[in-house]
């Protein structure tokens, strides 16, 4: 019956799925024959497009004679010198410039309890430093048997008159500060500069930046052996491996200097150098200190909130089981699907290869079918609150500081916004009462308060300026609520009758358009049709 009712669709599908053999082709079959291809030209295109995997897949590494000659030249561009720390310190003080690369390794993970209870924010230790001297075109490498040996560099690292250039300085700041060194004089971070040049580039490590800006494959350049692990001996010092490290990290610090020169040149070309120098680079230190200071968590308040949630979850579990007429695992999609669609005979909205779908979209559509759906949605919300914000936050509380030291990033989002991870402090819920309780566990020090400063609708002001939209400009000039005004027009409601929800929806529309949201994305966010 379904086939008969949809026979037009069936014939259309057949037409679409049939390969047309009657297409007029003017060229000869011989013209399509694959012959020898210009590997040097392909390599050039792949490098331009950063198709590094294809370079490997088609064995194009070092294919051209020019590339090989360039690599030989590049290998002779700097000299690795063995000097004493004292000699190098004098050179740095004289030049008032320090281009460096820190090598760090994860703390001993054999004792997981000690690792979890570590007071360090970043559970890594500094094992070496490489330094580049541009005047003499030399690199120096020092490895440390103990992390505290880097204290020999403390004076120059803390001297703000000595300008520093490196990569991922937010991490460097924390690594140094947690052992008692407060780095100052931060001038250049190549990962930040590269991000400004291309905010969609998420490969900002030294190896990828070297390929992008210098067209050098670091592994090929350094001569990293694939079987390097065979050289490892866990019970005795390995000289060959140490020499490999020396070679590798000396090259890295040299690359940092070369990449930095190219980045600064490009930033000036696009008039973004002042932005980099006066806004983004000072932000590195601000974000680093924010991560270092962390946010205090009231553990007792968190524990009490967790207890409340557990009690509410237990009550909801009991109610759901009673409404279903039997006990089952509410967290099991399979068991929940069987209860709702087989036992309770609710309409099937969507099926997956594993059975019935019970995702939030499906449950939202079934809310009017049975009161159990509302209970299940509430249950899931409470479970997420408990796992993400109660149990989740607990694991990030530093045992010494009693604070959460979230990582703040300025080189991740394509829009230029700051983001945070481990944990994400920017998605703490606010829209419902229980969500607001989560925020109450974050408290300032005694006698201090949190200050929330924000540009007022900055994106829309920029949009008004660029678009020269008279209505928007007038609204801002008259200090009118732009979102409320939009809601009034969209919902055809008098300005003084616009509800909080309508304003919120209009705000989503306004910002969604600015950031290029799709009709599907906006519909999903607002729960409306496309």
Q: Language-model features: where?
A:
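Conserved "right-hand" nucleotidyltransferase catalytic core of DNA-directed polymerases
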Residues: 1-143, 165, 209, 229-433, ...
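Structured ligand/cofactor/substrate-binding pocket environments in proteins
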Residues: 9-12, 448-480
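Short, basic/hydrophobic alpha-helical segments
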Residues: 147-162
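Acidic, metal-coordinating catalytic cores used for nucleic-acid/nucleotide bond scission
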Residues: 162-174
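Metal-dependent phosphoesterase core characteristic of DEDDh/y 3'-5' exonuclease domains
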Residues: 171-224, 286
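Short, polar/flexible loop-turn hinges at active-site or ligand-entry regions and domain interfaces
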Residues: 181-183, 199-200, 216-221, 240-246, ...
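Generic long, charged, amphipathic alpha-helical segments
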Residues: 480-502
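Short, amphipathic alpha-helical "recognition" segments used to contact nucleic acids or chromatin
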Residues: 505-515
């Amino acid at each position: 019956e379904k086939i008969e009712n949809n026979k037009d669709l069936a014939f259309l599908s057949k037409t679409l799925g049939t390969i047309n053999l009657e297409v007029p082709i003017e060229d000869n079959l011989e013209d399509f024959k694959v012959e020898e291809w210009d590997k040097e030209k392909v390599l050039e295109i792949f490098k331009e497009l950063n198709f590094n995997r294809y370079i490997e897949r088609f064995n194009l590494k070092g294919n051209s004679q020019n590339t090989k000659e360039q690599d030989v030249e590049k290998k002779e561009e700097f000299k690795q010198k063995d000097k004493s720390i004292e000699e190098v310190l004098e050179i740095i003080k004289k030049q008032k410039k320090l281009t460096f690369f820190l090598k760090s390794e994860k703390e001993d993970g054999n004792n997981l309890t000690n690792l979890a209870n570590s007071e360090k924010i970043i559970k890594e230790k500094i094992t070496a430093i490489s330094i580049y001297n541009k005047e003499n075109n030399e690199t120096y490498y020092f490895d440390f048997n103990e992390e505290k040996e880097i204290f020999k560099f403390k004076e120059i690292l803390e001297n703000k008159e000595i300008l520093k250039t490196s990569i991922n300085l937010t991490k460097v700041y924390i690594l140094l500060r947690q052992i008692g060194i407060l780095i100052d004089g931060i001038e250049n971070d190549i990962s930040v500069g590269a991000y400004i040049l291309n905010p969609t580039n998420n490969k900002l490590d030294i190896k990828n930046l070297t390929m992008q800006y210098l067209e050098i494959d670091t592994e090929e350049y350094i001569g990293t052996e694939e079987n390097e692990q065979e050289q490892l001996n866990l019970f005795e010092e390995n000289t060959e491996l140490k020499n490999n490290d020396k070679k590798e990290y000396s090259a890295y610090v040299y690359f940092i200097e070369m990449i930095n020169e190219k980045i600064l040149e490009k930033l000036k070309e696009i008039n973004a150098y002042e932005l980099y120098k006066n806004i983004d680079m000072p932000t590195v230190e601000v974000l680093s200190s924010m991560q270092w200071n962390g946010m205090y968590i009231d553990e007792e308040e968190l524990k009490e909130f967790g207890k409340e949630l557990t009690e509410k979850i237990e009550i909801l579990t009991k109610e759901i089981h009673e409404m279903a007429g039997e006990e089952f695992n509410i967290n099991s999609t399979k068991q929940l699907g069987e209860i709702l669609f087989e036992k309770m005979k609710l309409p099937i909205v969507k099926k997956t290869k594993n059975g019935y779908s019970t995702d939030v979209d499906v449950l939202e559509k079934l809310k009017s079918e049975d009161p159990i759906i509302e209970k299940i949605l509430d249950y899931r919300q409470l479970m997420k609150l408990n796992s993400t914000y109660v149990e989740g936050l607990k694991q990030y509380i530093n045992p010494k500081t009693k604070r959460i030291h979230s990582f703040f990033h300025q080189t991740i989002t394509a829009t230029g916004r700051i983001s945070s991870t481990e944990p994400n402090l920017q998605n703490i819920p606010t829209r419902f009462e229980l969500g607001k309780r989560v925020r109450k566990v974050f408290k300032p020090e005694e006698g201090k308060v949190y200050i929330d400063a924000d540009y007022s609708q900055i994106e829309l002001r920029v949009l008004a300026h660029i678009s020269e939209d008279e209505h928007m400009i007038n609204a801002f000039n008259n200090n009118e609520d732009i979102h409320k005004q939009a809601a009034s027009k969209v919902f055809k409601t008098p300005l003084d009758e616009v509800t909080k929800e309508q304003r919120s929806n209009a705000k989503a529309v306004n910002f969604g358009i600015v950031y290029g949201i799709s009709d599907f994305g906006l519909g999903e966010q607002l729960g409306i049709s496309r």
